[in-house]
Amino acid sequence: SLGLQPKTTQDFILKELEDWASFGVEGHFHARKPWLSYHEMFAEPVSKIVGAKPSEVVVMNQLTSNIHFMLVSFYRPAKERYKIICETKAFPSDQYALESHVKFHGLNPNDTIVEVEPRAGEHTIRHEDILFAIEKNKNALALVFMGGVNYYTGQVFDMKSITHAA
């Protein structure tokens, strides 16, 4: 899923490795691009992608770790509200994280995770099918977990409408 390596990547990584060798832990403060504040350079461009203010965005860790942090905070299954709706063929580690948290709460992923999939003969998920799944499961729904763009198909989801429906 990484695609082709950009031509400048190797030089960039080698410079970071040189700084690590030269500065050790002090690279957090004295590297050519100090590591301590590294995340700050991403706030502005990422905020535009997610429709937030730069002060509301932080880029940290790696995606799967962040998904686990998010699930610990927001997935609170109850007796009647325990289901998770997600798109089929989400990034595999996203699926593993969902299954992990469902099992942690003593639930069966087959009964808990509702995957919305394309109709027979189609390659993308119809928006109305996502909204239907939300409506159909509304009394048992604890979380809607949709990526903004499906990594496998490139399909862009209407997150505003999905969020409003949920």
Regions picked out by a protein language model, each given a short descriptive name:
Residues 1-166:
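Pyridoxal 5′-phosphate
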